């Protein structure tokens, strides 16, 4: 059995090719999903990649969440399909109501493009089960609206339920409580602002630490 991982492309998506390459790198079959698709083509998991979907008009992810393919993603996620949102994809998942909170302008209002260290705060998700608790990952961060914010009670709930998945070592964008990524209550949906798909081999990225997310979901799919 080969796991099929759907990779969504919206107008303005930049990192779909990189996400597909990461899926292939771990032995999965990437399946292209266009924003207007009305079905998910039988995939086992979905990646909503980074970029500037629909030009980030209104606000990042606000239009993409209404795309036909997202209707299918929301339904599939609520039935337990693993979904990963990276950067703009994280913003889309928050706009779609699959993850709590929102992403807003970085502190200082500057676009940040840096390799950053993350700590794995939870291994109890479909996308982080391969990691050791508190593992450190080196991955690229590239965003202008990457500051994670949520009401205090939501942040407390995320902390209390172990749903903070990644934290920044150095908080460059001002995210509340150093949060770089969070999960849904069932751990099947994960969003993070940095880019694991750009850290899949030392030749082209700062590390191969990002492969762990893709191996994790592959393990889950193959285990049935």
From Swiss-Prot:
PROSITE patterns: GATASE_TYPE_1 (PS51273). GO terms for biological process: 'de novo' IMP biosynthetic process. Transmembrane segments: none annotated. It comes from the Bacteria. This is Phosphoribosylformylglycinamidine synthase subunit PurQ. The active site is at residues 87, 195, 197. InterPro entries: Class_I_gatase-like, PRibForGlyAmidine_synth_PurQ. It comes from Mycolicibacterium paratuberculosis (strain ATCC BAA-968 / K-10). It catalyses: N(2)-formyl-N(1)-(5-phospho-beta-D-ribosyl)glycinamide + L-glutamine + ATP + H2O = 2-formamido-N(1)-(5-O-phospho-beta-D-ribosyl)acetamidine + L-glutamate + ADP + phosphate + H(+); L-glutamine + H2O = L-glutamate + NH4(+).
């Amino acid at each position: 059995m080969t796991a099929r991982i759907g990779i969504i492309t919206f107008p303005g998506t930049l990192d779909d090719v990189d996400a597909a390459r990461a899926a292939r790198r771990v032995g999965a079959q990437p399946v292209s999903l266009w924003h207007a698709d009305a079905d998910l083509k039988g995939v086992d998991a979905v990646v909503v990649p980074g970029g500037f979907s629909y030009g980030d008009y209104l606000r990042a992810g606000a239009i993409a969440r209404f795309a036909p393919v997202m209707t299918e993603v929301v339904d599939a996620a609520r039935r337990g399909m693993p979904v990963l949102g990276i950067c703009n994809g994280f913003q889309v998942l928050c706009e779609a109501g699959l993850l709590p909170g929102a992403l807003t302008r970085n502190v200082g209002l500057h676009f940040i493009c840096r390799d950053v260290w993350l700590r794995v705060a939870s291994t109890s998700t479909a996308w982080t089960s391969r990691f050791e608790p508190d593992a450190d990952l080196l991955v690229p961060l590239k965003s202008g609206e990457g500051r994670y914010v949520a009401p205090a009670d939501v942040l407390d709930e995320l902390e209390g339920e172990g749903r903070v998945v990644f934290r920044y070592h150095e908080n460059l964008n001002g995210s509340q409580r150093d949060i770089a990524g969070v999960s849904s209550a069932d751990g099947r949906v994960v969003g993070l602002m940095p880019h694991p798909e750009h850290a899949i081999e030392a030749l082209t990225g700062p590390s191969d630490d990002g492969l762990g997310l893709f191996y994790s979901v592959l393990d889950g799919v193959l285990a049935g």
